[in-house]
């Protein structure tokens, strides 16, 4: 985005090329980043903005010379020239972005071809599209609706916040109306103090009400602390950027930055099944932009008067300030306290693992530290680091923690990794084992999965699994396939603790 802005606003073609390279690399890092190529719309939109401003300037400058046939011809000729210049500029700017985009793709595709072969990449893309048969949250409709779902759900809070805005505007309007009938300076000053005090008090009441009603959690170890404040902030960002884009008096550079931020907030979540979390990752761009716009709003926007009726911006400023303060506190404390753990937050992180270099300096709960301490000690004693491992049981990070490379896929539990692919990869692994007697991957299972394989459903129930765990384990075709493989190749249990089981 920065490359696009510098390239367009300052006319530096090299930055446009760099922006194209960045977008191309983005696609290769994650295929579902493909929609971000829509950032090219910013190039075309800025070209049109420049063209419209040029036409306006032409009409203004020649209009001062008087309305004559000769002047009309000049206007027509200059507008035509401006159109030709626009098309030329659009072609050049688009060409530079496209050149950077294709350069990145060619280099990275070349690397893929050398290391793996393009057919493997194509197969991966085809698997990506076919996985929607079992992973319904990856369908295009599901991902798009998931994104809009949070915007719609958050209307519950936004409508109620709007009530505070209406109350503030009406209250200040009534005080202004009273002041228009009472001409005494002392009364006017008192009314003005009441307006400010009332607006600040209303903002405080709104913030207090939002906290009391559960708009945001005060436990900063889970996502509840920032979900709805974040969605509200994104909604405000989209509204403000649209407002500035279509404000005639806004400078073209401001329209450009507003348009780019609108695009990046809007399209980042496309292609993801994580709702609006990807867009929230762009708050480092949206937040300074919004605070800058809020500062300008407070500085330049006053009251609108119609006869004796006054619509004051004062309560709007105070209420927005209250929300921005709430948001700043929430994201600050969330960033300070949150620790990622299996897609959620975790509390009581007061222990460390002392025999694992990968986890050195990482804080976790005492229970988790005990699990990792035990398995790390066994891996160190047996010299298993560097050995291939087949991991199953929603514990993909163990491959990295223990420095044991995955035999074929570090997270075979995922719905997007279908059983047909697992069968193919395991067949290749077995062929290698048959050809090389020294090659024998370690099997690492989460304990409940291992117990189910060894002793069946009754033994699993003794461990009191949750309903979700039970649904993932019982009659799991992938797990049963791994169990058949272990039986066929004579794997035996060599390590067990409260969380993990190793078979060799």
Stretches with model-predicted labels:
Residues 102, 202, 247-264, 298-342:
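Signature aromatic-anchored transmembrane alpha helix within multi-pass, membrane-resident enzymes
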Residues 233, 440-504:
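Aromatic/acidic, Gly/Pro-rich catalytic loop(s) in extracytoplasmic/lumenal soluble domains
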Residues 219-240, 271-311:
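Hydrophobic/aromatic-rich transmembrane helices and adjacent perimembrane loops
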Residues 332-416, 440-454, 498, 503:
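Short periplasmic/luminal acceptor-recognition loop of GT-C membrane glycosyltransferases, typified by
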Residues 2-18, 26, 50-57, 62, ...:
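Membrane-interface transmembrane helices that cradle and orient dolichyl/undecaprenyl
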Residues 93-176, 207-213:
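Membrane-lumen/periplasm interface segments of specific transmembrane helices
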Residues 2-3, 15-33, 38-42, 103, ...:
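Membrane-interface alpha helices of multi-pass inner-membrane proteins
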Residues 3-9, 23, 36-105, 110, ...:
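Perimembrane helix-loop-helix junctions
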